[in-house]
Amino acid sequence: MKIKKKYCGHVIIVGKANVGKSTLLNNIIGKKISIVSRKKNTTQSNITGIKTEDNYQSIYIDTPGVVFDKNNNQMKHHKNNFYQTTQIATLIIFIIDRIDWTIHDEIILNEIKKTKIPILIIINKIDKISNKIILLPFINFLKKKIDFIEILPISAKKISNLILLKNIIKSYLPENCHIYPECYITTNSDFFTVSEIIREQLILFLGDELPSIIKVEIESFKKKEKIALYIKAIIWVKNVRQKSIVIGHNGEKIKKISMISRNNIEKKFYIKTHLVLWVKDKN
């Protein structure tokens, strides 16, 4: 019997903050593995998603949105991570927001061009473009920048052109053994998953009030047989003022955040969960 060839490679998703990288990743994988919000820089660290279909395995890395210094337009936060991640890439997906090409997109493009790795451009959120005719001149404008393997307009939310996107990605995967078992969809640890579930609720409840430096630390994670999960987590903020914002009047905000986080953890792990949240400041 002829053995099927296997294909496997890393696909890096890059772009400015809030262009839809995490939404795209979730839709490709078919499960929510990366939190999504309108707040910039929701993704704080690399999120790895794995999609195995037949003899093809794509390992996606959703990188934090590239942040720029307001004074000189230089890349700052996550810059080293940006370079390190591209070292293992088979393909780079560069996402841009509709036809909004800025100097920051130009800088990102110039950086990823240096890697000599094939680049696929995705024009996201096309559902928000009422006059689709304007897409053609914009695509022609992009074609003059570099010889991209493809320029694909999509709506990550509405999953338009997703099958075409997957087929393009498969065509660039090298012949290789699969790195992960077929059942794997992410390399995220349970600790990380829980901290992200909590952080998502902090973002949703606090919105613009949310301190940008907020971090969630899982202090303990204990499973009592298959009966219950006991979790203690610390929400770290910078100062007392930020602490009061997170807690809310009479503790109302933190109670709601805790309740919904607990429910979402139970849905994720299919087990009754006891969650204790502490808000601490670093001063």
Curated annotation (Swiss-Prot):
Cytoplasm recorded as keyword: yes
Positions bound to GTP: 15-22, 62-66, 124-127
Tree of life domain: Bacteria
Gene Ontology terms describing biological process: ribosomal small subunit assembly
Residue span of region G1: 15-22
Region (G5): 154-156
GO molecular function term, any single one: GTP binding
TM ranges: none
Family per record: Belongs to the TRAFAC class TrmE-Era-EngA-EngB-Septin-like GTPase superfamily. Era GTPase family.
Subunit text: Monomer.
Entries under HAMAP family matching the protein: GTPase_Era (MF_00367)
Name of this protein: GTPase Era
